């Protein structure tokens, strides 16, 4: 049989309309007895299709309704197919291994142990030692007896750094703790070092050439010479170019009074050949003294002690060294 195109379109439109579609679904469900998977049925918009979706439930319900009058126990079994199983206990009674409370308690316990460990570490011996000096009392000063000081000084003369055995033996001898003996030796060494420094500085001051150089006493016979000639050799000579050396009043030659009166400063009066050469020509502005000649005796007539002689010897050596340094300058 051949259908026209208009007839087929009408059939399609009638089949695709919502009302005809539901009727066809109902008829198909009654004939075939299968479930209908339409959008309205799945979403629950059409309540009439519940019987189509669960045809077995309706049959069970009718069957149970028919047998409910005779056997109520079987009704409960059919309505509740799992009723013969023992009911589950409350979830709070079952021990769950993934309970949040158990994890929180366990974490709290671990954190508590960690805090205790940190606190125990913080209370280490270092912190205890830091708090201990606050409670420590000041040690009293040890008063040594004469016998103890005598024995300690004798031991210090033998050795400035005694070993522990020597200190223990000495402590037993003087009836003192070994720690006190050790501290005494430390203080005694410090005192000894200070004394050594003081002595060394004193010796340096005594050995200094400027302090050891003392000007010897002048003889009365050369008294007028103080006003005419300078005593220091490095000062310029007051002699003028026109004044002869022998025309100065109070001037004495090298053979008159300097041999016995003033032996230390012979360079103030030049030798005779030098004086004669100075007469015709003018002296330079800075005259160089002649070399020191050791032809005058060192001993003085009124020499009091050997210390004065030693001082004069040092002065003589100092002047000679100064002359040697001035000679290249000339």
From Swiss-Prot:
PANTHER family, per the entry: HOMEOBOX PROTEIN, PUTATIVE-RELATED, RETINA AND ANTERIOR NEURAL FOLD HOMEOBOX PROTEIN 2
GO cellular component: nucleus
Species this chain originates from: Danio rerio (Zebrafish)
One GO MF term attached to the UniProt entry: DNA-binding transcription factor activity, RNA polymerase II-specific
Domain of life: Eukaryota
Classification via Pfam families: Homeodomain, OAR
Localization per Swiss-Prot or TrEMBL: Nucleus
Residues passing through the membrane, by range: none
Chain intervals for the UniProt region annotation (Disordered): 66-104, 118-142
Short motif (OAR): ranges: 306-319
Xref: SMART domains: HOX
UniProt feature, compositional bias: Basic and acidic residues: 90-104
Organism classification: Eukaryota, Metazoa, Chordata, Craniata, Vertebrata
Keyword line: Developmental protein, DNA-binding, Homeobox, Nucleus, Transcription, Transcription regulation
Sequence motif Octapeptide motif, residues: 37-44
A single BP term in Gene Ontology: regulation of transcription by RNA polymerase II
Motif mapping: Nuclear localization signal: 312-316
Predominant place of localization: nucleus
Coiled-coil stretches noted in the UniProt entry, renumbered to this chain: none
Protein name per its UniProtKB record: Retinal homeobox protein Rx1
């Amino acid at each position: 049989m051949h259908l026209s195109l208009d007839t087929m379109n009408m059939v399609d439109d009638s089949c695709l309309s919502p009302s005809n579609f539901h009727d066809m679904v109902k008829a198909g469900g009654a004939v075939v007895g299968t479930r209908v998977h339409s959008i309205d049925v799945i979403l629950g918009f059409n309540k009439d299709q519940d019987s189509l979706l669960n045809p077995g439930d309706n049959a069970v319900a009718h069957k149970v309704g028919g047998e409910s009058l005779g056997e109520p126990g079987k009704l409960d079994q059919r309505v509740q197919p799992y009723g013969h199983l023992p009911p589950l206990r409350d979830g709070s009674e079952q021990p769950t291994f993934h309970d949040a409370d158990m994890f929180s308690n366990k974490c709290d316990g671990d954190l508590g142990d960690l805090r205790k460990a940190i606190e125990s570490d913080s209370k280490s011996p270092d912190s205890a030692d830091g708090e201990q000096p606050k409670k420590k009392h000041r040690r009293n000063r040890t008063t040594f007896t004469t016998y103890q000081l005598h024995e300690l000084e004798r031991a210090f003369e033998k050795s400035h750094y005694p070993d522990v055995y020597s200190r223990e033996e000495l402590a037993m001898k003087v009836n003192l703790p070994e720690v006190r003996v050790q501290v005494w030796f430390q203080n005694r060494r410090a005192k000894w070092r200070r004394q050594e420094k003081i002595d060394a500085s004193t010796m340096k001051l005594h050995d200094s050439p400027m302090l050891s150089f003392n000007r010897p006493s002048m003889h009365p016979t050369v008294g007028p010479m103080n006003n005419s000639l300078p005593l220091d050799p490095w000062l310029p000579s007051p002699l003028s170019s026109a004044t002869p050396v022998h025309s100065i009043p109070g001037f004495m030659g090298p053979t008159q009074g300097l041999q016995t009166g003033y032996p230390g400063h012979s360079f103030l009066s030049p030798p005779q050949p030098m004086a004669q050469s100075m007469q015709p020509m003018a002296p330079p502005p800075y005259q160089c003294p002649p070399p020191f000649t050791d032809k005058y005796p060192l001993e003085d007539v009124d020499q009091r002690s050997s210390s004065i002689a030693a001082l004069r010897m040092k002065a003589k050596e100092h002047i000679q060294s100064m002359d040697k340094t001035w000679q290249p300058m000339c």
